[in-house]
Amino acid sequence: AAYLLAKDYVNGSPIRQELLETALGWISEGKIEGYMSARQHDPNANELWTFFRNVIEWVRLTFPVYRREMKGVDWGRLYKAYGGKVYDTAALETRVAALMADDDVTSKKGIYPYVLTGEEKYLNIRAFTAGQKRAAYERQQGVCPYCKREGRAKVRHEIDEMEADHITPWREGGRTSAENCQMLCREHNRRKSDR
């Protein structure tokens, strides 16, 4: 029953009890042995079965358009963190569809955690190519624009002392393209990323 319910959303085989392990990991937040030990005398696994069904039902209601990228997402963790919130599913679907079509998003599976958390790390935004970095470095003549603006003594850096940065951030519509690439010294790139 669990396999039929969740086969599109969870990796694993029911024969090797991987679905059970996934459900236990979700409900126990990874502390399976402690969860099992505390419930070893329970007459049944209704708590676990109810939780598992609730997670899958929440996924289906929150993201009604199924895509193969949904399989294997850590839905249990997302359910525990965001399952109590009400979402505009049409707006979520519009966002998911746009991100699925975005070539800069290399982790399509990460779209689902991203639309709930807002954390870009899940998307694995495409990095600038070596050629794009070199072109930006040459165009800037190795000068970090932030160092120059601050009037620092050292404004020119070797290419291996610099990192590529989106001039217009990806979240504001900036593309991972040569035109949107600038080279910053490591210090300024890290400072800019922390904002």
Question: What residues fall within each predicted segment?
Answer:
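Long, His/Glu/Asp-enriched segments that create or flank divalent metal/ion-associated functional microenvironments
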Residues: 122-125, 183-187
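General structural signal for secondary-structure boundaries
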Residues: 1, 43, 129-130, 195
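Solvent-exposed functional surfaces
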Residues: 1-119
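Histidine-centered nuclease catalytic patch
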Residues: 130, 136, 148-184, 195
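A generic secondary-structure signal for well-formed alpha-helical elements
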Residues: 188-192
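A near-ubiquitous, low-amplitude feature marking generic local secondary-structure context
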Residues: 42, 119, 127, 164-168
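Short, charged surface segments at domain edges that flank catalytic/cofactor-binding sites
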Residues: 105-152
